[in-house]
């Protein structure tokens, strides 16, 4: 009579490790720190708790084990979302749409989800994080200088006036356009303008005017290329003014 003796094997699970036991390829249970004996048809896969968990089989099957489900942190990121992962207080990674799993207990994780399908950044994300190399690809920004005002258009529709400052929005398919205006005093010049006086004397006039934009909505929303329109209005006003005087009268005006 021949008796076949099946050998057993010993597996040690170290601190900050987790073992998953499979029997004939089917998940059985989770192991914590300690030493264990197994039959040859059983296998143990060891995982480092300080690293993300990549499920060897369908995750939903593993999560049916209450002990394993309790040991895992499952992060679900939807379409048009990103998740910022902070590890021990520092930004570690940014995740796009998908499902991610991490072990609890070994590392202090914090996740901040953001809906990047909208424009406004309403999530609790600091400016320094928005400028981080991992987050910057998802962000667009515009700077309005202290001497400027701007108007914000979203999908071609006027949204609001922007005062001086730096503005950040999520980068997506929504069209964002910012029109700026310099609010400092500016000078408009007309050189070599040929104008007839009241007595038909032909003059070549050089003139200048100073102006300042005070109503940005009127300048940009109600007028197309307001500066060109202002130039034309200045030309017409100058012609009308000069045409109201004879040549001699103009000389008297200019020499007063």
Give short role names for the model-derived ranges:
Residues 1-256:
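N-terminal hydrophobic membrane-entry segments
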């Amino acid at each position: 009579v021949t008796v076949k003796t099946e050998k057993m094997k010993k597996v040690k699970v170290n601190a900050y490790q987790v073992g998953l036991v499979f029997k004939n390829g089917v998940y059985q249970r989770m192991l914590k720190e300690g030493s264990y004996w197994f039959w040859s048809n059983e296998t143990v896969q060891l995982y480092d708790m300080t690293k993300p968990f990549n499920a060897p089989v369908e995750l939903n099957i593993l999560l049916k084990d209450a002990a394993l489900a309790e040991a895992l942190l499952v992060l679900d990121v939807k379409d048009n979302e990103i998740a910022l992962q902070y590890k021990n207080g520092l930004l570690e990674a940014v995740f796009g749409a998908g499902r991610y799993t991490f072990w609890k207990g070994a590392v202090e994780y914090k996740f901040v989800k953001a809906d990047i399908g909208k424009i406004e950044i309403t999530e609790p994300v600091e400016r320094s994080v928005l400028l981080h190399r991992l987050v910057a690809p998802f962000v667009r920004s515009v700077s309005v200088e202290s001497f400027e005002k701007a108007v914000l258009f979203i999908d071609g529709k006027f949204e609001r006036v922007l005062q001086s400052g730096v503005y950040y929005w999520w980068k997506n398919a929504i069209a964002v356009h910012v029109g700026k205006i310099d609010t400092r005093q500016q000078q408009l010049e007309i050189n070599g303008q040929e104008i007839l006086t009241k007595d038909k004397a032909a003059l070549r006039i050089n003139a200048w005017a100073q102006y300042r934009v005070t109503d940005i909505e009127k300048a940009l929303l109600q007028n197309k290329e307001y500066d060109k329109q202002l130039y034309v209005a200045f030309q017409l006003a100058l012609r009308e003014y000069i045409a109201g005087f004879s040549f001699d009268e103009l000389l008297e005006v200019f020499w007063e």
